[in-house]
Amino acid sequence: MRRPTITIDASHTLGSGKNTGIERVVRNLCRELPSVLQERGCPGLQIATHFQSRFLEVDPGLEQSLQFLSAWERNAGEFVPGWIQSIPKWIAASSHSAKLRKWMEPRPSHLGIYKLPHHVVRWGSLTRKALEGNAIEPSADRILILPDAYWTRRDIWKTVEAHRKAGTMIATVVYDLIPLTHPAYVGKKRSDKFQSYLDQVVRNSDTILAISKTVRDDVKQYIEAQTDRSAMCQDVRAFVLGAELSVPESETTGQSIRSVVKNLFNASSPYPPYLMVASFDPRKNHTQALDAFDLLWQSNPELQICFAGRSGSRCDDFMRRIEQHPKLNRGLWVFHDLTDMELHHVYEHCSGVLLPSIVEGFGLPIVESLWHGRKTFASDTPIHREVGGRCCEYFPLHDPMTLAKQIQAWELMRTAGSTKGGIKAAVDWSQPTTWRQSATQLLDAVLDSFSQRVSMPQVRAA
């Protein structure tokens, strides 16, 4: 069988200052696929970004430009002179509008008023590469993998359709169907946008790769419910996400970890914080975690909790609760912009990890926590049971008292020193999937689909 060229698009992740689960997935796949491709005897990996109806190959020069843009988005204030910032800060201080204040003084991973200059620089960098002839041409010997957040980049689909009609095989990663199955958490506008995105996925993909068996089954049910499913993708598979963070061993004790993070998550501290890694979003259920700690603080004031995640939508009430909480910065900590190195550090030194999500497509922090050997408390949902197996301690949703009791019981064991060896010493603990194994599963799935396509060519819809 001829070996295809593998192209992976990372349009959203490459220029994004965000570090949510999706960006971590895309970066890890881009890191691991080259060596897996070499093992399989395939040509080297092409990393692409989409711009003006074409896919551009990301060479070192373009990668450097996109890394600059990513850092700019991660903390816009660092890239703007103070005298310029003083104007929007004055407007924010004078305004009674919360929306205007957020626009004038954007939180980490938000551009706010600096969005226009950011887009101008991005447009200039990509235009220059387009003129240099970096465009990737469609080919019947190419597989285009789409693992990114395409509900935010709807302009990509006409280009995908053109490449597919010209013979390129399209493999799309689907993370969840939550905006359709639980629209109350995103609102009608975002739910409608996601509906449009999913329609493009099922109509323009030769293979769909779900990040869990649960999501795979959800996608299959969605397709089966459509009246014109003959024009939709019939090859829906699942693969498992990796667990380790992409941090070189030489850098885990490097200077890139901020002192406030090092001091808070200190190996010598008797009460390092418990950790919740999740974007601030109602479905992530931060409320139950904080409710549990409000109960714990009544008798255990020394306990601490740290929320790590970017500020999302529909979270203003909870953010206000945090800002007004008497334990803020005295047992209650918040970070919106932890890097992978800092995430590695806090996972290594936290007292335990909480995942109270109401619904997930996978729950990446579960496997990240287990990889680091942390005690992991997860809400009792089917997807968490699928991912965490017998390695987690499960608690009922909307029941902070039970969670508080579980944490208190763990604290008694932890502080008594009866948890020597951590959860890795437990009989039920098993090594989570590595990103190399995850990339191998994904690649083997798309190569299998490609080989079937070569042996049994399909007539594509015009």
Predicted region positions:
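Carbohydrate transferase catalytic cores enriched for Leloir-type hexosyltransferases
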Residues: 1-462
